[in-house]
Amino acid sequence: MPFTQFLDKYSDNLAIQYAIIFALLLGVFKLTVFSLKFASLIYDIFLAPATDFSKYGAASGKWAVVTGASDGIGKEYAFQLAKKGFSIVLVSRTQSKLELIATEIESKYKVNTKIVAFDASTDDEENYLKLEKAVFDLPVTILINNVGQSHSIPVPFLKTEKKELKDIITINTTATLRITQIVAPIIVSTVENPHPKQLRGLILTMGSFGGLLPTPYLATYSGSKSFLQAWSAALAGELQADHVDVELVISYLVASAMSKIKRTSLSIPNPKQFVTSTLNGVGRRNGAQERFATSTPYWTHALMHFAIDNTVGVYSKIANKLNLQMHQSIRRRALKKAARLAAAAEKKD
């Protein structure tokens, strides 16, 4: 039946006519909102210029604090920020690794470095005092909250070892909050001081698809990253008036020691590719179009995030089930590999 005939049929029924008009207007509104979000996504990923870090004090004697700086993504943040002209405070567990990285940064980029050997799993007050002593008199404008830990392999929550559970919560949440409480006031103080142009501060905290979507078999890790999402957005609201930009950076998989993935692919960048996209996209939402103070910067991750948000949704039953099946499969393969290695070791003995 043509639409005009349909309307004529119900011309005397005002309730149905109003319902039809409302449905049409709602459809136009939804389509317009989706189109604007999709246009913003494409602009953010492919067309927007790279962020100018001069507003954060690049090449002007300012400092950046990078946690988890000895490997992977954290190490890459340190190198790329040093390349932009920031001196770097390197915070991580292993002193010897930090010393090598500091030497390379100073030699290659002619900036200063400081080292803080810091085991985030211990929640030791001496660690925090050591960090505070290292940074209290520095003009810090950037904090990269990169330190983190996941499960060794996907595991049901009821079978999670107590130490692993405690370490994940302590490293991902407690240490991140305590470090931010130490460094953020210094950032606020630095950008408050008179400058030729208004400086801004920046706090980036590493999130994860594991926090975006509730993830069975990574329940503790997933919960810790979800906590960071809410905390970071709340902190962003608090520090806006202090000229400090706060963002949660969401990633899917990145080839690194933590992910145990060695090969890159279209959806799995190496740390250099991921950090480049993150720093270039500071201030833009990319794939996180519906989320305040949040970015999913790497282009394939951004498209995946946008697609999930605009189809099944992150809290849907189907998303949870697919996540469960994927991590059950990963666990089975990991256990088989461990069994093969154990059998091979027994043969050698």
Curated annotation (Swiss-Prot):
Keyword Glycosyltransferase carried by entry: no
Record keywords: Endoplasmic reticulum, Fatty acid biosynthesis, Fatty acid metabolism, Lipid biosynthesis, Lipid metabolism, Membrane, NADP, Oxidoreductase, Transmembrane, Transmembrane helix
Superkingdom, taxonomy of origin: Eukaryota
Pathway listed: Lipid metabolism; fatty acid biosynthesis
Subcellular location: Endoplasmic reticulum membrane
Family indicated by similarity: Belongs to the short-chain dehydrogenases/reductases (SDR) family.
Protein name as annotated: Very-long-chain 3-oxoacyl-CoA reductase
Organism, scientific name: Candida albicans (strain SC5314 / ATCC MYA-2876) (Yeast)
